[in-house]
Amino acid sequence: MKIIREAVAGTLESSDVMVRIAPLNPPEIDLQIHSSVDKQFGDAIRYSVLALLEQYRVTGVQLIIDDKGALDCVLQARLETALLRASDEKILPWRAH
C-alpha cells in the first residue's frame, strides 16, 4: 500500500488514540509514539503498529501515535482508517484471526 497524502483518524479523548500519517521516501518508517501508558504498553503498541504496517506492506510513512489508553482493537481500527484515508485504496483486504 502506498501512502500518498496526509491523514488523521481518532481523537484525543480518554481510551482513544489519534493516528496521524504522512508520506515519506520508501522504505523509511518514522514511528513516533506518545502514550499515557507508555511504560506499561509502549512495546505492545509499537509491535501492533509495525505488524499492521507489515501486513499491508506499507513503507515510506511517518506515523505519529497519540495514545490515551486505547485498547489494541481501537488502535488497529484507527490505524487502518488512517491508512485508507492516506492511500488510493478503497477497501482493506479482510483477514482471518
From Swiss-Prot:
Keyword Chloroplast: no
Predominant place of localization: cytoplasm
Role this protein plays: Covalent carrier of the coenzyme of citrate lyase.
InterPro entries reported for this sequence: CitD, Mal_deCO2ase/Cit_lyase_ACP
This protein's name: Citrate lyase acyl carrier protein
Annotated GO CC locations: cytoplasm
HAMAP family in alphabetical order: CitD
Protein keywords: Cytoplasm, Phosphoprotein
Protein family membership: Belongs to the CitD family.
O-(phosphoribosyl dephospho-coenzyme A)serine modifications at: 14
Quaternary structure, from the entry: Oligomer with a subunit composition of (alpha,beta,gamma)6.
Location in or out of the cell: Cytoplasm
